[in-house]
UniProtKB/Swiss-Prot annotation:
Pfam families: FAM53. May play an important role in neural development; the dorsomedial roof of the third ventricle. The keyword Phosphoprotein applies. It comes from Mus musculus. Its main location: nucleus. Belongs to the FAM53 family. This is Protein FAM53A. Transmembrane segments: none annotated. A motif (Nuclear localization signal) lies at residues 273-281. GO terms for biological process: protein import into nucleus. The keyword Nucleus applies.
């Protein structure tokens, strides 16, 4: 090994030797102090990945600028050689091994750039199972949830005991019919998977005799399985066992009563509930509210003003005319009777002519003298009137007074 190293060193120039030694030596020691592992994946500025072998010699991929091939003893290219020569003695590799095996914390955490690559060496990642966090209120491992909700077949596979043919034939969707090798002496009655709402029954493996395929004793997985079930399955199973004649078809309440309790320990049951569903009160108020048609309202107002009020005026004017003609009165009395009822209907007084309202009868008499006997003038005056609905009361009062 030493002969091979010296031969390769003689073939290199002196300036290349010093440059590469300065790059590889202190940089690798600094990286070792930071990461705490044996050989980090990146050592020099050229970023050549290094891997730790069991022999303790650093090896790596082929260098981009190294002119030599890999040696027969596993030593790679010239950067690895300079890194080995920069160490003070041959016992330095063992010193680094002791540094890696020590359980003390590293001097400094690795930089953020190397967090994923330096988290675990490849040797330990191969033989170790993937990391799973412990169960807590926030994080529930997926394997535990599968064991508890996947039916009896998953639980038998997790326990690792029993007949493999039995474990393969039991499917969570099919009814559970445990085949007992000793005969039909088992007190357990098979129940379908729907009776326990997708979860494993607490009666399986929790009795004193155990499952029928395990005649040696109770299931070793039952205590661990029982922790995740609700309080209903922790009760004595002798009282919870249904009778042999009762089936889920004959007694449909069986599956509901033997299901999981609706409590906080089983949050998956609450998914079917309608929680905090908002009531739609806006739509109800919208349907009860009457719709307003403003065009129709204006149309009816016009019709009522032009038709209804005119009919009332025509009737009242006809009665006035008949009474006036039939009664023996002089012309002055006739003019005096007609004037108060028709005087507000004559012309509409403007803001500059208030004398018509203030003067009273003497000014209204000449205007009404010619049109007193013509009912058509009264109708035309009624259309122009300011108060078309209040004139009836005034007419009756004047008639009674005179």
């Amino acid at each position: 090994m030493v002969t091979l190293i010296t031969e390769k060193l003689q073939n290199q120039s002196l300036d290349d030797l010093t440059r590469r030694a300065c790059e590889a030596g202190p940089y690798s020691a600094e990286k070792l102090n930071k990461s705490g592992h044996l050989f980090p994946l990146e050592i020099s500025v050229d970023k050549s990945p290094w891997k730790a072998l069991r022999g303790g010699w650093p090896t790596g991929s082929q260098a981009a600028s190294g002119p030599f091939s890999v040696g027969p003893h596993g030593v790679s290219h010239t950067e690895g050689l300079k890194w080995q020569l920069e160490s003070p003695g041959p016992m330095d590799v063992g010193h680094f091994l002791d540094l890696h095996d020590s359980t003390g914390p590293p001097a400094a955490p690795p930089t953020k750039r190397h967090c994923r690559s330096l988290s675990e060496p490849e040797e330990l990642a191969r033989c170790r199972s993937p990391w799973r966090p412990g169960s807590s209120k926030v994080w529930t491992p997926i394997s535990k949830r599968r064991c508890n909700s996947g039916g009896s077949a998953t639980l038998q596979c997790c326990s690792g005991v029993g007949n493999p043919t039995l474990q393969g034939t039991l499917v969570p969707g099919l009814p559970r019919r445990p085949v007992s090798p000793a005969g039909p002496t088992s007190p357990l009655t098979p129940r379908p998977a729907s009776a326990s709402s997708g979860f494993v029954d607490g009666s399986e493996g929790s009795t004193s005799s155990g499952p029928p395929w395990l005649s040696t004793g109770p299931c070793p997985f039952s205590s661990r399985r029982r922790l995740s079930l609700s309080q209903e399955h922790l009760v004595d199973t002798g009282a919870c066992l249904p009778s042999a004649s009762s089936t889920p078809t004959s007694t449909p309440e069986l599956g509901r009563h033997h299901g999981l309790l609706r409590c906080r320990s089983q949050p998956c049951v609450l998914d079917g509930r309608r929680v905090r569903r908002k009531r739609r009160r806006e739509e109800d108020a919208r349907w009860t509210r009457p719709s307003l048609d403003f065009l129709k309202m204006t149309r009816t107002l016009k019709n009522s003003k032009s038709l209804c009020s005119l009919d009332y005026e025509d009737d009242e004017d006809d009665t006035q005319e008949k009474t006036l003609v039939s009664s023996p009165c002089n012309s002055q009395g006739l003019v005096g009777i007609i004037t108060p009822s028709s005087s507000p209907r004559i012309p509409r007084p403007g803001p500059d002519s208030p004398s018509i309202w203030a003067s009273g009868e003497p000014e209204a008499n000449p205007g009404e003298g010619g049109s007193s006997g013509d009912p058509s003038d009264w109708d035309s005056a009624g259309e122009e009137g300011i108060f078309p609905l209040d004139h009836g009361d005034l007419d009756l009062e004047q008639i009674e007074n005179n």
